[in-house]
């Protein structure tokens, strides 16, 4: 777990400008698609139907990846399938009269950070909404739904009143001074909340996005629960938008762990999901008109991550431009077009032979942005790419234009495949970075529970297991480790947290990526 920055990506700015200029130059030969858009219809494309033949490679990897959510669960476990895990954190929330025992530990430690946990839930919901059929075809939908609800149950309980939300359980400094199994931890676990006097718009808005998106997932499965999630989402969004401020400004110690660099992207992200969940035009106007102009940074897109939601928002809102949105005003349509133009520029920057391709890659072809948790950005980018390619297929949009060159949905999907294949072992190290998949994967994942024998009595000071050079006695199935350095190398050492620590938010988009690659199929034109 480490801090990161949003940072603007110069290649993306160049890509966007080039894309907009080129689009204007050839507008006469561009054919309008459903809901508008700028894809050139070179020839009719078949719209794929329901999932067909399953690619077992990605289906098997999906089954492995989803197990990590079981590994990370806190609380009283139900139908536990991880033999070395047991109940933990049962008293979380009790000082405030709350049950905060559920939720998930964010990475290799035992803190519950609501910010990345909520992001995990949001992208997991998005993955289910886009690729639930693929998950069902591989018998992985129920595990995905179970993981999602385990998080949203926590988020609901962490929101006991309109303007109060608990953003953290545990003391990170104290936790990091211990190396122990979650089942035996005994140190104090204080609660941290945001409220009207101690705001945290970034965390509150991300929680709103999580519960709004999850409300759509559960709408046909549990109406009462779905309605409850939506009510919490709406109240949290109002709270976040009314009492603005960063949680890491309110609580400076957070800057050492999850240092959010802005809350505007979360507000747009949350409002976008609330529009999809409710159809309320107020939310669409929020993201496309005044607040879109103020917060969306059209022309300055960034990498999708737990910190920065703009690229995800751009792709999510582009589906409205691909498939149409009911009763939109001219101003709203213009805003949606700007989101799609920006999303298209992001896609152009990802394609390796595009004129505007980013040079931020390893020699092995992995998109590489940061040394810490390097696979995060590659996984997130590949997820957005496969989603965007499926929007194109479903809307029969034949190509995107990148500085005068055209790229088909297959080209975009091939980029996503390249990143997935790298993760699964097609890389210079010949190593699967998904623990439990393939014949060779990291053996010393930086993970407390996995590194300590289930019957060990360590107390807080089990650091001999951190520094041991032996393989973990317990396999953290489904963990996506941090990943390689820019030279494609990887040091499998438990002390090397930069490369060997895993996180739930990486797993959220990995599940979506693998689900999208299980088989090519059309996506629903509406979530509801």
Curated annotation (Swiss-Prot):
Gene3D superfamilies: 1.50.10.10. Residues 1-24 form the signal peptide. Keywords: Carbohydrate metabolism, Cell wall biogenesis/degradation, Cellulose degradation, Glycoprotein, Glycosidase, Hydrolase, Polysaccharide degradation, Secreted, Signal. The active site is at residues 109, 446, 492, 501. Glycans are attached at residues 259, 487. It is found in: Secreted. Coiled coil: none annotated. GO terms for biological process: cell wall organization; cellulose catabolic process. Transmembrane segments: none annotated. GO terms for molecular function: cellulase activity. InterPro entries: 6-hairpin_glycosidase_sf (IPR008928), 6hp_glycosidase-like_sf (IPR012341), Glyco_hydro_9 (IPR001701), Glyco_hydro_9_His_AS (IPR018221). GO terms for cellular component: extracellular region. Its EC number is 3.2.1.4. Belongs to the glycosyl hydrolase 9 (cellulase E) family. PANTHER family: ENDO-1,4-BETA-GLUCANASE (PTHR22298). This is Endoglucanase 24. It comes from Oryza sativa subsp. japonica (Rice).
């Amino acid at each position: 777990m480490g801090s990161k920055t949003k940072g603007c990506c110069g290649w993306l700015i160049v890509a966007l400008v080039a894309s907009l200029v080129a689009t204007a130059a050839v507008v006469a030969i561009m054919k309008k698609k459903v809901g508008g858009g700028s894809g050139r219809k070179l020839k009719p494309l078949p719209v794929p139907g329901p999932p067909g033949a399953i690619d077992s490679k990605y289906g098997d990897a999906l089954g492995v990846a989803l197990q990590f959510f079981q590994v990370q669960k806190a609380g009283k476990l139900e139908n536990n399938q991880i033999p070395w895990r047991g109940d933990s954190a049962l008293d979380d929330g009790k000082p405030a009269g709350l049950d905060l025992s559920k939720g998930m530990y964010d990475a290799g430690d035992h803190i519950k950070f609501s910010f990345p946990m909520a992001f995990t839930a949001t992208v997991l919901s998005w993955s289910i909404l886009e690729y639930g059929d693929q998950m069902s075809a591989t018998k992985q939908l129920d595990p995905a739904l179970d993981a999602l609800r385990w998080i949203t149950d926590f988020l609901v309980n962490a929101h006991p009143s309109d303007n109060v939300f608990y953003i953290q359980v545990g003391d990170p400094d104290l936790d990091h001074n211990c190396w122990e199994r979650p089942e035996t931890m005994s140190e104090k676990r204080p609660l941290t909340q945001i409220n009207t006097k101690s705001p945290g718009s970034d965390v509150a808005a991300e929680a709103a996005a999580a519960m709004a998106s999850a409300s759509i997932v559960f709408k046909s499965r549990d109406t009462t629960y779905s309605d409850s999630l939506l009510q919490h989402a709406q109240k949290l969004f109002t709270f976040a938008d009314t009492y603005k401020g960063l949680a890491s400004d309110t609580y400076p110690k957070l800057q050492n762990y999850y240092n959010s660099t802005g809350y505007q992207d979360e507000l747009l992200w949350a409002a976008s999901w609330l529009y999809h969940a409710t159809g309320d035009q107020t939310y669409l106007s929020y993201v496309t008109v005044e607040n879109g102009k103020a917060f969306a940074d059209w022309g300055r897109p960034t990498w999708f991550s737990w910190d920065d939601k703009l690229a995800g928002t751009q792709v999510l809102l582009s589906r409205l431009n691909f498939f149409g949105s009911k009763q939109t005003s001219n101003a709203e349509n213009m805003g949606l077009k700007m989101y799609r133009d920006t999303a298209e520029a992001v896609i152009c920057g990802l394609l390796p032979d595009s004129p505007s391709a980013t040079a931020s890659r390893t020699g092995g072809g992995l998109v590489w942005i940061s040394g810490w948790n390097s696979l995060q950005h590659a996984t997130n980018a590949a997820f957005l790419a496969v989603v965007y390619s499926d929007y194109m297929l479903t809307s029969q949009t034949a190509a995107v234009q990148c500085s005068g060159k055209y790229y088909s949905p297959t080209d975009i999907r091939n980029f996503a495949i390249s990143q997935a294949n790298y993760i699964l072992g097609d890389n210079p190290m010949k190593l699967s970075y998904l623990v439990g998949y393939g014949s060779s994967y990291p053996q010393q994942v930086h993970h407390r529970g996995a590194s300590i024998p289930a019957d060990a009595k360590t107390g807080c000071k089990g650091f001999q297991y951190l520094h041991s050079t032996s393989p973990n006695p317990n396999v953290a199935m489904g963990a996506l480790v941090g990943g390689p350095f820019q030279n494609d190398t990887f040091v499998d050492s438990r002390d090397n947290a930069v490369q060997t620590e895993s996180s739930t938010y990486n797993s959220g988009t990995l599940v979506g990526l693998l689900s999208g690659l299980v088989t090519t199929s059309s996506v629903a034109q509406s979530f509801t």
